[in-house]
Amino acid sequence: MSTTTDILPDVHTMRDTLQRLAPGTPLRDGLDRIVRGHTGALIVLGDEENVTSICDGGFEFDVTFAATRLRELCKMDGAVVLSSDGERIKRANVQLIPSPSWPTQESGTRHRSAERTALQTGVPVIAVSESQNTITLYVEGKSHILEEPSTLLNRANQALGTMERYRDRLDQVNTRLHMAELHNYATVIDVVSVIQREEMLRRVGETIDTNVLELGREAKQIQIQLTELRGDNDRERGYIIADYLVTDGIPTDETITEALEAVSGLDDKSLMKPSNIARILGLPPTEEALDEPVVPRGYRTLNRVPRVQKFLMDKLVGEFGNLHALTSASVEEISAVDGVGSLWARHITDGLARLT
């Protein structure tokens, strides 16, 4: 059975901290009690030496964390310091004295202190606003306001609707490209359209991931739908790059990753310009070139044949060079490839035949 300590990261991140603050967790219960009580709070999620060095006054103790204890201790003006695993309350009513040289965009005293403490120590800090009844998390140099579960659920459901439309459109362009590949009439714009839709699906899925983290156990149904809509998109993104990235020989994992990161680095407007995707692939980025024919190496199609692993795909692509040569090869020619053998050769040729 895992404990809170088991999931603690070596470096505090927004993602991990949001998971610790999800509805239903003891810490979120304590924060919700503070909000309902209309009192402010300043809570530090860690008692490392760089935290204790900026603590002044208050009192030290070491008691088991409880939501009710946190609520009562936060009635005092000072900050509350928890252990790094959040299991114990270490200090209360302390004044935090971070360096004023740290930049902050906050106006309230409590929030300015929270942001500067998080920046200086690298430890997550929470500020609860007494006047606005909001919970703000500071970590990784960023701030994030925790929202009500009902608000998050509505947003996640809206995003799922968007993702469903993206999935439908991706399936359409994917099918069109698949048929074009098999019948030797694929063009640059066919490839670009699939990459664009795959990236759009990835982005909206990433947004929903954050909602799922914040919702915690209340996101079970959202997670099921997200997994279904996402499908094999991450793997397929890599295979289409492997099929069409212009390189000498077979693309390496490193070059594929670089191309994927370049696509992910485009803003939404730039993503919708086909020339930008073509340029990343190493293809001519002109409008005229978008209708030029392209020939896949065969990774996407081989991925549709059950149980064919990436290392086997590399061997086949390395031997035959492209999908057309591969689909034209006999069982004997495929079985002659090092590491394939007759059983796999028959399985692969039968699988390719069914796809065509």
Swiss-Prot record:
ATP binds at G78, L96, T109, R110, H111, R112, S113. Its cofactor is Mg(2+). Keywords: ATP-binding, DNA damage, DNA repair, DNA-binding, Magnesium, Nucleotide-binding, Nucleotidyltransferase, Transferase. The keyword DNA damage applies. One of its GO terms (biological process) is DNA repair. Pfam families: DAC, DisA-linker. Residues 11-149 form the DAC domain. Participates in a DNA-damage check-point. DisA forms globular foci that rapidly scan along the chromosomes searching for lesions. Homooctamer. NCBIfam families: PRK13482.1. This is DNA integrity scanning protein DisA.
